[in-house]
Amino acid sequence: MNSANRKPLPGTKLDYFDARAAVEAIQPGAYDKLPYTSRVLAENLVRRCDPATLTDSLLQLVGRKRDLDFPWFPARVVCHDILGQTALVDLAGLRDAIADQGGDPAKVNPVVPVQLIVDHSLAVECGGFDPDAFAKNRAIEDRRNEDRFHFIDWTKQAFKNVDVIPPGNGIMHQINLEKMSPVIHADNGVAYPDTCVGTDSHTPHVDALGVIAIGVGGLEAENVMLGRASWMRLPDIVGVELTGKRQPGITATDIVLALTEFLRKEKVVGAYLEFRGEGASSLTLGDRATISNMAPEYGATAAMFFIDEQTIDYLRLTGRTDEQLKLVETYARTAGLWADSLKNAEYERVLKFDLSSVVRNMAGPSNPHKRLPTSALAERGIAVDLDKASAQEAEGLMPDGAVIIAAITSCTNTSNPRNVIAAALLARNANARGLARKPWVKSSLAPGSKAVELYLEEANLLPDLEKLGFGIVAFACTTCNGMSGALDPKIQQEIIDRDLYATAVLSGNRNFDGRIHPYAKQAFLASPPLVVAYAIAGTIRFDIEKDVLGTDQDGKPVYLKDIWPSDEEIDAIVAKSVKPEQFRKVYEPMFAITAASGESVSPLYDWRPQSTYIRRPPYWEGALAGERTLKALRPLAVLGDNITTDHLSPSNAIMLNSAAGEYLARMGLPEEDFNSYATHRGDHLTAQRATFANPTLINEMAVVDGQVKKGSLARIEPEGKVVRMWEAIETYMDRKQPLIIIAGADYGQGSSRDWAAKGVRLAGVEVIVAEGFERIHRTNLIGMGVLPLEFKPGVNRLTLGLDGTETYDVIGERQPRATLTLVVNRKNGERVEVPVTCRLDSDEEVSIYEAGGVLHFAQDFLESSRATA
């Protein structure tokens, strides 16, 4: 911590670092023109940056330059149990590597506070129509994840600065919003803004509080944990002016789905957005959080709202202390982070969005930014052939387009009391008119916070949700993360026998093909009340705005408009039923300081050799420790646009006929305990078999009878044999054949899944060439020592006529965004040289790549520190 520009914070006993004074010393009048993001980054620099480089770093912000890397020191790291656990497995492996070199393994410790929330490992095996669903699902979670939870328990004692919230307590982002983020820290006599990185792409959820919180991969998080700065160049900071007010009956979900479509078209990938204007100030904190949460879906790195009265009201509502409320307001007003202080902020680009233009929306199929107005269901070819579906139902069959999963799920929506109360009121109204859930619909309610249960009980609305089959099944990510659990065997068999087009409707944030359930061919995102309505309708062929949901006790038809609650009633019940004491009741015991057990544990983990969940990582051994030649590379896959991390390494249930399923069966696991791909990511032998295991993958090399065949397939060269992807990977591993992947635009979008990079690296991939990369996945690739290269505009796999029979070399000096040469050696002997951009974007990224990745970089750093100590 520096000493210059440290001053007393008025009205407190704390000091603060005066970023305004530091900026004004460089350029008078500049601070008032800085966006919110730049002001927070400036404070971070003034407090933490090496004084020798402080002025040059601040000039990047003041002059809006992008020609110098500057450091950012996040205050916290938040993790869920999948990437958080794999990060800690990596650190445990690093301890082993340090010990093998004669070093002290106990020196490997997080320096930055790490908060790990176990929220990703519960599957909805029992739906919300089972009154004992919560207890049953938790028991199954504990049984399946005993190895993982044993390791996580060890980390609490073996590592310093690691706090763990055990399973069954909520979703990391919602807990972060409602409790963990102080907005302003008070530490060692100094007040400063909260900032954090999280091992989940939806970490921007707390941007709604004015906290810079961004999603990173597990590998980048490990770097931050070990106390290293996160180096960056000034991002694009885009102002988004929200005008107007929403129409009656429009939810925050409708708004964010419309914004996601709008912002994707405006190409804000990688940008930090700042929502401002009268429309922004009128939104509740819950509505803001819904918008900030989906930053990765519209491609932004951050989605900031300013600190204002809405922020203070929310902090009060969620049980923060009066002292903390005063600190947040005092600091924000003093440091220029209060909304009124941002009126003169200048942006290089400003977008405008009218909230009054938003209609009732869904998204789908297949992509969150594919907005689907409910008024256009018929014209889009979704709500068609209802007569056919109704006839099938009358014959005792499931209808075409059957909604087999209807889930109120995800931090995106269950952290917003208006959305949850709206769903409960619609359920109450539906029950009053005699409507019911269709029997083939697996319905569930999985709030991200235990406070949701308390305010639903306070409003006496939980019984109405339970009556329609939306009882609470968990406080966890569940269906949104692909953990929707098994279907009723009879329903599943009917889907298989009839090759039925079945769907899912969920209040989640992603609906990529194959993500939600293997037998839900497509999925649609919708607000919580619409999810309830579709459970009643039972088929996506139903025109939710126009068709009759059912008939009441008097034989009268019931339409959606008849049971949709009014805004006035929703707001009245929220105001009456959501109370600070509910949040205190939930979080005070959860975060109570418990006495240390007194038990000491070894600094080295005792790996269980038969475990399929936790295994010593291999990153310091064998081929991964060897040289990457970047020569004679063969393509593992040639891919199109929009390849997601779900394509690269899926999270959902493991099927018996998959490579991972066959491996688990050989290891003695019964099929019902295979669990999900996500839960096995601490064991590389299981997790690497998930690489490209998505059945919806389209690898353009997998040509069978003249047609590209969909599935987890690859073509072994030079034989030209199309086989299962894992068979190709094993073949190339045996041959020690270095590999390359060729892809289209937006490669790696979706979850911040480090195994999407680890899997391809373990397969032998050294290079990925694409038309564009999503930010988090690109940094994960670098963190694993995989070189990301980008085609120049107008050049791609199609213009070059690439078919996978080629071999490739990469020539040139690897420097930030340098032009390198991709040499294409065609089968006919022709040699083509293609200029490509090296997507190592900073000197730090070059250093990490050249070291072989984050873990080798960290090992070198720790060993050099030991040598000079």
Swiss-Prot record:
Q: Which UniProt keywords apply?
A: 4Fe-4S, Iron, Iron-sulfur, Lyase, Metal-binding, RNA-binding, Tricarboxylic acid cycle
Give the superkingdom in one word: Bacteria
* Residues that bind [4Fe-4S] cluster: 411, 477, 480
**Which cofactors, if any, are listed as required?**
[4Fe-4S] cluster
Q: In which pathway does it act?
A: Carbohydrate metabolism; tricarboxylic acid cycle; isocitrate from oxaloacetate: step 2/2; Organic acid metabolism; propanoate degradation
According to UniProt, the reaction catalysed is: citrate = D-threo-isocitrate; (2S,3R)-3-hydroxybutane-1,2,3-tricarboxylate = 2-methyl-cis-aconitate + H2O
Cofactor: binding comment: Binds 1 [4Fe-4S] cluster per subunit.
Q: Name one Pfam family in it.
A: Aconitase_C
Function of the molecule: Involved in the catabolism of short chain fatty acids (SCFA) via the tricarboxylic acid (TCA)(acetyl degradation route) and the 2-methylcitrate cycle I (propionate degradation route). Catalyzes the reversible isomerization of citrate to isocitrate via cis-aconitate. Could catalyze the hydration of 2-methyl-cis-aconitate to yield (2S,3R)-2-methylisocitrate. The apo form of AcnA functions as a RNA-binding regulatory protein.
Membership in a protein family: Belongs to the aconitase/IPM isomerase family.
Q: Assembly state and interactors?
A: Monomer.
Q: Protein name, please?
A: Aconitate hydratase A
- Identify the species of origin: Cupriavidus necator (Alcaligenes eutrophus)
